[in-house]
Amino acid sequence: MMFRLTSVSCFLLVIACLNLFQVVLTRRCFPPGVYCTRHLPCCRGRCCSGWCRPRCFPRYGKRATFQ
């Protein structure tokens, strides 16, 4: 009986540890200068054009001119 109780306890402990690792790994974030997406967030700053940056700068390019 003691062996069965110990093996069940170990099995439940393994399941609890796997759930904990899953939460830790899925909630990770990336430092500035690393590739990011909407599903892979940045730790600090924002995801600008696919890269973690402290702040996003406006994109320069062709703009409409008003007269």
Swiss-Prot record:
Classification via InterPro entries: Conotoxin-I_CS (IPR013141), Conotoxin_I2 (IPR020242)
Q: What are the annotated GO cellular component locations?
A: extracellular region
Instruction: Return the similarity comment.
Output: Belongs to the conotoxin I2 superfamily.
Cystine residue pairs: 29-43, 36-48, 42-52, 47-56
Origin species: Conus capitaneus (Captain cone)
> What are the Tyrosine amide sites (modified residues) in this protein?
60
Record carries keyword Cell cycle: no
The entry's free-text remark on domains says:
The cysteine framework is XI (C-C-CC-CC-C-C).
Q: Which Pfam families match?
A: Conotoxin_I2
Q: Identify a single GO molecular function assigned to this protein.
A: toxin activity
Q: Where in the cell is it found?
A: Secreted
Q: Which UniProt keywords apply?
A: Amidation, Cleavage on pair of basic residues, Disulfide bond, Secreted, Signal, Toxin
Q: Does the keyword Ribosomal protein apply?
A: no
Name used for this protein in its record: Conotoxin Cp1.1
The upper taxonomy is: Eukaryota, Metazoa, Spiralia, Lophotrochozoa, Mollusca
Q: What is its main location?
A: secreted
